[in-house]
């Protein structure tokens, strides 16, 4: 059987037009059974029997026979869509069999809340009673009240746009003054208008302040505001905050608002999910290149072993910046060439040593140790080079003329 025969049989059996029959068959890839089921879903059987013919339709004379036997000049008006009642289709509508297609009719019913009380039945044949299930969690009654109020006062985004100020698209008007007419009366001024959005002015008493927006999330184990922490339902203080919100008052510390400040609270229903703390980006602090690495001091812990660490300098050293006073161990010979070496100390201070080129690295270590005692090493920051406490290497041999050194604690 080709498609034309299937289309003809489908239209004759269901009393529909050829265009309608072709639509249903093409929608189901010319599957006769699926097309019939789809037709029953789109046009239920009770709609055809529930229609009452209007006065105009009742006046149309009934035509019997095939269309080839019709004669006359006037064209027959299109007959209303009719379909024979399918007894099998009514049997499927009883609810025993599942539908193959979901239509808009299935979505017309109101959404039932998952927390509605269930009705139970008890008793015998003649003493049956309908018992309403108790509240599983009476602490969440305030949450249900707030959600119900939020549902009743829901405003669509289109309504918010319509209720917004219409003055943004209007033009502002002002007055101008001709040059050289400062002493004339104000009535001689010429009005000037400018199209486009007006300039934003700070809010005044006549201009209402724009309300803040806060999002209130209700989770399975508590509630939260925006990305803030969770407040459990078991805490009596949190129950008091819910009572404030239910009465239309905003807790200042919870919503982060000031007194008499307008606020819009958006309620999000997440009762089927547990609260998960939002991801926070990494936060920390950096360390300057060449800064001191302080070894942590170990302490005695209960049940643990005591570890003794090397003693480090914990007493702050008062070092004046750019101090050029030499240490007593540095004997400066004014007749020999001298140089200045800047040392950045481990405690954040800085000192400047005046030495001869004949002084050794050991002399520099002793001078720095007198200012900032402890175990340390001296290094050149760039190019990176560590200086050993060597009494045989002079300042000139180490190329430390006008150099900058860094003290690093061990």
Swiss-Prot record:
PROSITE patterns: SEP, UBX. Residues 334-410 form the UBX domain. GO terms for cellular component: cytosol; nucleus. Pfam families: SEP, UBX. It comes from the Eukaryota. The modification Phosphoserine is found at residues 156, 167, 186. Coiled coil: none annotated. The modification Phosphothreonine is found at residue 190. GO terms for molecular function: ubiquitin binding. Residues 46-139, 154-212 are annotated as: Disordered. Keywords: Meiosis, Phosphoprotein, Sporulation, Ubl conjugation pathway. Residues 65-85, 163-174 have a biased composition (Low complexity). Involved in CDC48-dependent protein degradation through the ubiquitin/proteasome pathway. Involved in delivery of substrates to the 26S proteasome. Also required for membrane fusion and sporulation. PANTHER family: NSFL1 COFACTOR P47 (PTHR23333:SF20), UBX DOMAIN CONTAINING PROTEIN (PTHR23333). Interacts with cdc48. This is UBX domain-containing protein 3. It comes from Schizosaccharomyces pombe (strain 972 / ATCC 24843) (Fission yeast). The gene is ubx3.
């Amino acid at each position: 059987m080709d498609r034309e025969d299937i289309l003809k049989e489908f239209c004759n059996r269901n009393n529909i037009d050829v265009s309608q029959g072709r639509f249903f068959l093409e929608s189901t890839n010319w599957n006769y059974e699926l097309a019939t089921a789809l037709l029953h879903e789109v046009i239920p059987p009770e709609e055809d029997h529930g229609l009452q013919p209007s006065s105009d339709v009742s006046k149309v004379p009934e035509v019997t026979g095939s269309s080839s036997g019709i004669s006359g000049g006037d064209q027959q008006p299109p007959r209303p869509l009719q379909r024979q009642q399918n007894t099998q289709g009514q049997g499927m509508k009883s609810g025993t069999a599942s539908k193959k297609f979901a239509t808009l009719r299935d979505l017309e019913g109101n959404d039932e809340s998952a927390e509605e009380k269930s009705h139970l039945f008890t008793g015998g044949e003649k003493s049956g009673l309908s018992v309403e299930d108790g509240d599983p969690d009476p602490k969440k009654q305030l949450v249900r009240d707030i959600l119900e109020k939020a549902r009743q006062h829901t405003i669509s985004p289109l309504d918010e746009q319509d209720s917004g100020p219409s003055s943004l698209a209007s033009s502002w008007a002002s007055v101008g003054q001709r040059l050289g007419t400062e002493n004339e009366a104000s009535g001689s001024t010429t009005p000037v208008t400018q199209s486009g959005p007006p300039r934003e002015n700070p809010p005044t008493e006549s201009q209402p302040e724009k309300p803040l927006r806060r999002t209130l999330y209700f989770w399975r184990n508590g509630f939260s505001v925006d990305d803030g922490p969770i407040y459990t339902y078991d805490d009596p203080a949190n129950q008091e905050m819910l009572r404030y919100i239910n009465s239309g008052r905003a807790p200042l510390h919870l919503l982060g608002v000031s007194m008499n400040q307008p606020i819009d609270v958006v309620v999000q229903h997440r009762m089927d999910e547990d609260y998960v703390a939002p991801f926070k980006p990494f936060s920390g602090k950096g360390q300057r290149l060449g800064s001191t690495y302080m070894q942590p001091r170990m302490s005695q812990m209960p049940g643990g072993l005591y570890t003794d660490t090397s003693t480090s300098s914990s007493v702050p050293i008062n070092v004046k910046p750019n101090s050029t006073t030499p240490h007593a161990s540095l004997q400066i010979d004014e007749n020999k060439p001298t140089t200045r070496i800047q040392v950045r100390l481990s405690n954040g201070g800085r000192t400047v040593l005046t030495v001869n080129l004949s002084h050794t690295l050991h002399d520099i270590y002793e001078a720095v140790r007198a200012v900032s005692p402890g175990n340390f090493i001296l290094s050149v920051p760039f190019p990176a080079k560590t200086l050993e406490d060597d009494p045989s290497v002079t300042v000139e041999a180490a190329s430390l003329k006008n150099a900058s050194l860094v003290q690093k604690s061990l």
